[in-house]
């Protein structure tokens, strides 16, 4: 491919050759009407390129005898040649107010010179939408600056050399009326507000630039362009390491940091290391109770400046933008525009994939990532990627330990505002989620969803081993341990292992004697909250579990299940030694001790062993002389409940034990057994 210098030489030859002039008619007319002037290099080219006025306007060094500034390899000055610094454009005089040039399209600069031919890196090339426009804004041209330095570009149709800068111009005209930013101090005009800002040295607030998409205002044209790229979804900044593209240069810089393996910032307290200084500073604030950021309005202190800024917004009363529908006021006009779409129902941003519409362009961009699978926000610590920046910020708190949301009642901090809202209901007792079937209320929506499965019978969580279904995922996880036999939770005192953490916690109460759950009626304490709930039904008399066969009610669901086996004759618990079956697992456990001879329950008074704890309790009454079971009819007391029940049959006359041979009834089972011996002798 011919070099750019070869093309420039060819262009100079073509410019001197006969044929149609490459100058625009308006430019030719302006030059022909103005008095010709000579300049350094005019003898070499033989062309009076501009008038005295124009030359002075374009080059501030003109008529300065001590200045011999020239650009690289430039023998003479054309009106297209300008210096790259912003001061040259800022010093255009009012005598040249009618001649402001428009930046050409890339294709107009040179038909056969592409961005690649110019040496523009792929990561800095312009988006397609910008490269097809007629004007290059300063921000757009800024994409082309940097590695190119001071390279001159030649156009085949002109003897013009262009430097890649915001001041690149072509021989095209823009009327003076289209320059919206006059400068009162010197009468100078600029095509872009950012040029005026650079001239004044102070950002202008009187003439802000407004985004047509969202109504947000900007002080500079580059900020506006960057905002518009967010709406279009174009990604113009490419990462050299992984090839991923981004719409903002700041995001690209963050991406570069994620590729860096070095974690330069290490905490002296805990040794944790961070790549970014902001994450490091945020983390350090959690080691100390220092809160250096104080609100001047109410005196409340914060450990982070960002938390203070969020808090200060609550004191801001000025909201000049008011909705004429509902009267709600906003601090920003863009927020009002977005709010008004709630009343109008307008959803101007439509997904081209599924047709779903959104009120905000940002929501459309987020939604579109569900189709593309794009996750542009990556954690610099662990590399995990997210589709939304908010999700990344929440995730980063896992690494930093930051908990910026603090409960005003108890001071407990949380990493997420949603968790703070849920926690606050503990103090208020609020239960906003109500079941439409039974009226029961819940503090969390997830609890309501799980509760409703009682009414619907839905069991969405299925075991992939045996196919058994469950209403709750937690119950499924517990069930799956049956198949694996895993017992990952081990007691540090006795070494006993458990399949569930809750079972380990309950077991540890045996060693500590801790019984934190107390009944407010009688003061009895329990090691498990579930046992307290069951106990409280003794006081309330509540029996919520009813048998559908006989109507009998029970205080515990397990008792109902055991009772129902009487009706269906089911005895699922079978002894593997003798084959005897039982309707309760507890009865099987007791029975198996007959085969093993195990008597784990020993009396501390006499050393006698028992296979069941209930037998030990009954035995201990012998030593204490306690008789807690008293007859309500005659006042007689007994050491065992079973003996009291037998005694009460004297008063009631109940004889539940019938002889199958003769039909005679007895109040005690032992008497029936003795009676049956009469029939066996016969």
UniProtKB/Swiss-Prot annotation:
InterPro entries: C2H2-ZF_Transcription_Reg, Znf_C2H2_sf, Znf_C2H2_type. GO terms for cellular component: nucleus. Residues 62-210 are annotated as: Necessary for transcription activation. GO terms for molecular function: DNA-binding transcription factor activity, RNA polymerase II-specific; RNA polymerase II cis-regulatory region sequence-specific DNA binding; zinc ion binding. PROSITE patterns: ZINC_FINGER_C2H2_1, ZINC_FINGER_C2H2_2. One of its GO terms (biological process) is cellular response to sodium dodecyl sulfate. The keyword Transit peptide does not apply. The modification N6-acetyllysine is found at residue 487. Residues 1-10 have a biased composition (Basic and acidic residues). There is a cross-link at residue 253 (Glycyl lysine isopeptide (Lys-Gly) (interchain with G-Cter in SUMO2)). It holds the Pfam family zf-C2H2. Residues 1-38 are annotated as: Disordered. Residues 268-393, 341-373, 473-503 are annotated as: Required for nuclear localization. Acts as a transcriptional activator. Promotes cell proliferation by facilitating the cell cycle phase transition from the S to G2/M phase. Involved in both the hemin- and phorbol myristate acetate (PMA)-induced erythroid and megakaryocytic differentiation, respectively. Also plays a role as an inhibitor of cell apoptosis. Belongs to the krueppel C2H2-type zinc-finger protein family. Interacts with INCA1; the interaction inhibits INCA1 activity and induces the cell cycle process. This is Zinc finger protein 16. It comes from Pan troglodytes. The gene is ZNF16.
